[in-house]
Amino acid sequence: MSSDLYANAVLYSEISQRNPELVSKMFNEATRKKLDAFLKDNEAPKLKDIVTDNVFKKRKRIASSSGNEPPVKKMAAKDSSDSDSSDDGAVKKNGVQKPVNVAAKKSATPVQKKAESSSSSDSDAPAKKLTPVKKPAQTPAQKKAASSSDSDSDDEPPKKAPAVTTKVAPKPMAKKQDTSDSDSDSEDSDDGKSKKANPVKVTPVANVLQKVVAKKAASSSSDSSDDEKKPAAKPTPAKPTPKPVVKKAESSSDSSDDEKKPVAKPAPAKATPKPAAKKADSSSDSSDDEAPAKKTPAKAAPKPVAKKAESSSDSSDDEKKPAAKPTPAKATPKPVAKKAESSSDSSDDEKKPVAKPAPAKATPKPVAKKAESSSDSSDDEKKPAAKPTPAKATPKPVAKKAESSSDSSDDEKKPVAKPTSAKATPKPAAKKADSSSDSSDDEAPAKKTPAKAAPKPASKKAESSSDSSDDEKPAAKSTPAKITPKPTAKKVASSSSDSSDDEKKPAAKPTPANATPKPVAKKAESSSDSSDDEKKPVAKPTSAKATPKPAAKKADLSSDFSDDEAPAKKTPAKAAPKPASKKAESSSDSSDDEKPAAKSTPAKTTPKPTAKKAASSSSDSSDDEKKPVAKPTSAKATPKPAAKKADSSSDSSDDEAPAKKTPVKPTPVKIVAKKVDSSSDSSDDEKKPTKATPVKVTPKSVTKKAAASSSDSSDDEKKPVVKQTPNVVPKKEKAASSSDDSSDDEKKPTAKPTPKATPKQSAKKADSSDDSSDDEAPAKKTPAKSTPAKTAVKKEASSSSDDSSDDEKTKKKSATTPAKSTPKTALKKAESSDSSDDDEDLPKPSKAVTPRPQRADSEESAETEESSSRTPALKAKPLATSTEKAVYENRKRKSSPFRRVQMTKDSVSEKFRNNQHDSHFDQWGQRANESLGKVVGKAFRHEKTKKKKGSYGGGPINQSINSIKFSDSDD
């Protein structure tokens, strides 16, 4: 009899006894028949015979000791075991694999048991007892898992029982895989072997199957990367008892990862050795990688840092599996180093589990890897190599922070992922690809990361902010620092990604302070991450690199928008380190909490904080809702406004929120570029790049403006208050801060880009339709950033679109500044029309209308139409009414009583002219008709009543339907 059959028979009999319901799910009919027949002829040993009670007890003891946090570990283990089961399933060659898949699905039940067994490698045996449930889920997986995972070293000793033969066959295969995997983790695996061998020995066949699976899960969870590399790593988990944290992190990461893609793991495990390859894989295997990433994390297990990274990488996995939450607890223990790496590895792990181990061993490499990884996420597709260079050791922590910020929104989504997220974030690039899955993950990590990130405030924070987006594009961050030119390119890409990134990783903003170019790129990445995380769109990473992907981003953004809101909140926690910035953020946090990430970034840009704060303050009132803090970054991001703008449009919803902020922030006009940016950043936070772009490209700014105006429409709607403030503040600063961009923009941009505005307005308008909300926000940003001239245009766009209400308020100011206003007004008004929402929102359109005369363009016409639609329309109606009234009254005002319409037979169609009763089929009707036909008026009613009340004296009543079908032509 084949070892597989024997093992299956043991499992089958055990499961049928303990949890019969699972049998049908784990074994198909053919298999069941086969096993039944086999069991008739041969009596399969029982688990009790294979595994002694005393081993179970031992294991149990170990289990409890192995993790003081059994629940967490168990959960993680559960997930990991689950994934293991699936993994094993993948390894399995037999048809059992199918059952495995089922088992994986069912892992919930098995998982519990498995959780126990997996919770501690040692506890696996006892878990086995419980395993019955577990067994079903893992049976195939277990067997094969056992063989595959046990094959490492577990199986051989455990197999001593009948299992030896049983599992031996599978072992080779599993072992092979494991071997490749275990090669990297040979040490761990060896240790695990020794450890495993002892407990496992007793666990033969059936037990081993489950145990192995459980163990595998445990090891996978504990040695997520080890596991991946070597299920044998299980022992390591046992060993790692001291490393419970690591284990847990891994476990959690494994849990979700395993759950997600246990199958993918094996391949990733192999891939691990080749980070580059893995990276490639990682992009393609973003989801797969997640599962593999888990394994890789396991590898990292020996190396706390790596492990944590794994944990973080698992974070995204965790995202999928709340089990990851427990991991956070453990993950916390190995804070900085681990976290940094973990963060960098987090996304990397997801994408390149292999990379993770490397990072663990060599932080420098991890950074590079991270860079790659992050670059992988957005750049991976584009230029992972470039990013590695930027990757710095510090970046990791920063990455973490970035993760944290990026995670902030993610955190909201998946608090569980938090621990892992923190780590996962670091490898945003990879993560980015995985980002969608990581998005929630990041959220969780964000929380943790902030705490840790705090330690490395200056570099980390700066980097962190940069990392925020950098996390996704660490390379971008580093590279920008190293290579400004690249930053630009990157920035553009990042810019587009920034829009959402900003929301997600305002931290990037602070970095901008450090490196204006970088921030943008980072931000782009960050934003890319935010939405990427949520959506996992590969396009996003690309978009980070290539503005062209804004569309994709936009889609992402929409998802990001909600995501970002969550992250923003978390990010603020991070931001805490920088009081000033934070304060601004704080105010902005009130409503900005939704987008604290942006704030965090501002926090980082402490230098700008004061100005920002002021802007933040005024803008915060209403902008708080949106993220005034982000503005600082905007200033930096300025360079990549164009790209950002695209992103901005992408960030329609995001921008809306930011847009509001933007007006607020521009308090100081002098900082105008920056502050405007800052104000614009508020929305720019979400769309920092937008502003930046305006500075660089006035034309773009105009375009942006239009877009912004349209997007602002929502923003304006959202935050008319802020705009009102602008009204009050005619001064540039005040205008900037209060009007935000409204008066500021008007004043500044007024003279500036009328020409540009007009042409771009068209484009913008188009954009605005697309990015109605988004563009508005970006527009605001853009204006802020635009060079004075550009700023004028931008601001105008910003003020006009951003502050549609502002615009109108501003327009008053605009009117005040006729010279400037005229060009601006045109643009603005055009934008105003673009931000029809804004105009609609605010009765200011009339104001807008006032400047309108100055705008002589389609813009004016459009705006006029809009305001007209509001005010003019109303006015028009009155006029029409007055004229019509006279005529109407003349006709109507004859004091004549209401009279019935006189119908002449000529006006009735032939079909209906004869209204006579057709009595040839209805005697009763005929009789009634005779009496009723002669009567008209009140008498008819009387006659009819008599007929109704009288006794029926006719024949059968005809119940056929004699109605007439009217056709349209028969009117």
Swiss-Prot record:
UniProt biased composition (Basic and acidic residues): 907-921
Chain residue ranges for the region called Disordered: 61-926, 938-971
What family does the entry list?
Belongs to the NOLC1 family.
Which protein is depicted?
Nucleolar protein dao-5
Which organism is this entry from?
Caenorhabditis elegans
**UniProt key word Heme:** no
Keyword annotations: Nucleus
List this protein's GO terms for biological process. Answer: dauer larval development; determination of adult lifespan; insulin receptor signaling pathway; nucleolar large rRNA transcription by RNA polymerase I; regulation of rDNA heterochromatin formation; rRNA transcription
Q: In which tissues is it expressed?
A: Expressed in the nerve ring and hypodermal tissues. Expressed in the intestine. Expressed in the germline.
